[in-house]
UniProtKB/Swiss-Prot annotation:
Name of this chain's protein: Photosystem II CP47 reaction center protein
GO cellular component: chloroplast thylakoid membrane; photosystem II
Keywords: Chlorophyll, Chloroplast, Chromophore, Membrane, Photosynthesis, Photosystem II, Plastid, Thylakoid, Transmembrane, Transmembrane helix
The gene coding this protein: psbB
UniProt function note: One of the components of the core complex of photosystem II (PSII). It binds chlorophyll and helps catalyze the primary light-induced photochemical processes of PSII. PSII is a light-driven water:plastoquinone oxidoreductase, using light energy to abstract electrons from H(2)O, generating O(2) and a proton gradient subsequently used for ATP formation.
Superkingdom assignment: Eukaryota
Membrane topology: Multi-pass membrane protein
Organism from which the protein derives: Cycas taitungensis
């Protein structure tokens, strides 16, 4: 046929058997990739420190999704929450990965079978003896089956009725674990951060899908609608399927980037808005104030701050800090976090507390400025010493640490004070091991950033694909130069080009 590369899919245009075959093969490739990628990630994943070296710092991509759906144990004897496991059972990380690979192999064999045995009676129209598909009926079947799967997922898996539940955590990502979720049927179910909405929406959408599927199975479309929307053309199916996919991709790009119950901080890392709004900083401050009100010392109050919470309040965990072409995990950038040094409090020579102004997300460098509680600049690291009035040396700034490894240690040496002031721009200060992975010190994005970028990009491409194929199917007669009501058998499978004189015609 001599088809160009971008037209090769026309070989399955009028061939239902092989159309089915290539879709089964596609499922085999997707499932095989998922299982293989999971095994690769498990081979390189270090579960030893879930607090300072969690999965998202190590660049894991499929493990967070498996964990979100209720898997948390490994055949290696470890659990994602840090405990030792003796009997992980079949539904462990390795078990699920293996199941995907086995399923991929079965789909591969099924695809080959359907490619060889393409001319099945089920695909033949009894009236004409020609291959054809009843597309509205197939639509009803798919809608019904996906509705059953959606309902089953929400009513059984998520609720824990028959299944483990899903990953649920507190608003600050500290206490996450897999647990059953009760459906939220009130207005709170529409809050994207309420896990109960996941159960209720799956149940509601599943019921709707089942009813819609039964409707499309039992009611035929009117002839004018059938012809107007080209319901007999497989390219109509392609166009509307692409629409469903790009719509879903845009939705999940949003829920991932802005945060939601479906994208927990513990599994995918913080969002950039949590840095921009000082989300974790405010919670830390609230806890410290609460400790001081209970007559704890500053040191005791800061020592009660969970290391996990302090680690979230560090700009290196902001997914928007990674560059477009900076490949690799966060650990390959600023290094593996080893320990929290503690919270630095800066004071001038009169003893007034000073606060380092934090670096905004989209800055690579930022001036070191220390302000008082009213936001007035009191000290800085000047660019030109000759004209400086607020230098650390002139103001006599000192720093003392509370909590963490340097608890109770203070420094008055200007060089050391400036070093910690620069690091305080980036949030809480951590000791980072850059030697082990030969980390280059340049921030990387988290899986949250990769997922969002990938899905937003492909959603845009698929949007144009929907427009393209929708236009092709709606205006097929115009593009092909062939009247859709023509009483001739036209070999569209071989050629479908504008006014092609070689297109075979046979009067019926």
């Amino acid at each position: 046929m001599g088809l160009p590369w971008y037209r090769v899919h026309t070989v399955v245009l009028n061939d239902p058997g092989r159309l089915l075959s290539v879709h089964i093969m596609h499922t085999a490739l997707v499932s095989g990739w998922a299982g293989s990628m999971a095994l690769y990630e498990l081979a390189v994943f270090d579960p030893s420190d879930p607090v300072l070296d969690p999965m998202w710092r190590q660049g894991m991509f499929v493990i967070p999704f498996m964990t979100r759906l209720g898997i948390n144990n490994s055949w290696g004897g470890w659990s994602i929450t840090g405990e030792t496991v003796t009997n992980p059972g079949l539904w462990s990380y390795e078990g699920v990965a293996g199941a995907h690979i086995v399923f991929s192999g079965l789909c591969f064999l099924a695809a080959i079978w359907h490619w060889v045995y393409w001319d099945l009676d089920i695909f033949c129209d009894e009236r004409t003896g020609k291959p054809s598909l009843d597309l509205p009926k197939i639509f009803g079947i798919h809608l019904f089956l996906s509705g059953v799967a959606c309902f089953g997922s929400g009513a059984f898996h998520v609720t824990g009725l028959y299944g483990p539940g899903i990953w649920v955590s507190d608003p600050y990502g500290l206490t996450g674990k897999i647990q059953p979720v009760n459906p939220a049927w009130g207005a709170e179910g529409f809050d994207p951060f309420v896990p109960g909405g996941i159960a209720s929406h799956h149940i509601a959408a599943g019921i709707l899908g089942i009813l819609a599927g039964l409707f499309h199975l039992s009611v035929r479309p009117p002839q004018r609608l059938y012809k107007g929307l080209r319901m007999g053309n497989i390219e109509t199916v392609l166009s509307s399927s692409i629409a469903a996919v790009f719509f879903a991709a845009f939705i999940v790009a949003g829920t991932m980037w802005y945060g939601s119950a479906t994208a927990p901080v513990e599994l995918f890392g913080p969002t950039r808005y949590q840095w921009d709004q000082g989300y974790f900083q405010q919670e830390i401050d609230r806890r410290v104030r609460a400790g001081l009100s209970e007559n704890l010392s500053l040191s005791e109050a800061w020592s009660k701050i969970p290391e996990k919470l302090a680690f979230y309040d560090y700009i290196g965990n902001n997914p928007a800090k990674g560059g477009l072409f900076r490949a690799g995990a966060m650990d390959n950038g600023d290094g593996i976090a080893v320990g929290w040094l503690g919270h630095p409090i800066f004071r001038d020579k009169e003893g007034h507390e000073l606060f380092v102004r934090r670096m905004p997300t989209f800055f690579e460098t930022f001036p070191v400025v220390l302000v008082d509680e009213e936001g007035i600049v009191k000290a800085d690291v000047p660019f030109r010493r000759a004209e400086s009035k607020y230098s650390v040396e002139q103001v006599g700034v000192t720093v003392e640490f509370y909590g963490g490894e340097l608890d109770g240690v203070s420094f008055g040496d200007p060089a050391t004070v400036k070093k910690y002031a620069r690091r305080a721009q980036l949030g809480e200060i951590f000791e980072l091991d850059r030697a082990t992975l030969k980390s280059d010190g340049v921030f990387r994005s988290s899986p949250r950033g990769w997922f969002t970028f990938g899905h937003a990009t492909f959603a845009l491409l698929f949007f144009f694909g929907h427009i393209w194929h929708g236009a092709r199917t709606l205006f097929r007669d115009v593009f092909a130069g062939i009247d859709p009501d023509l009483d001739a058998q036209v070999e569209f499978g071989a050629f479908q080009x504008l006014g092609d004189p070689t297109t075979k015609r046979q009067i019926v």
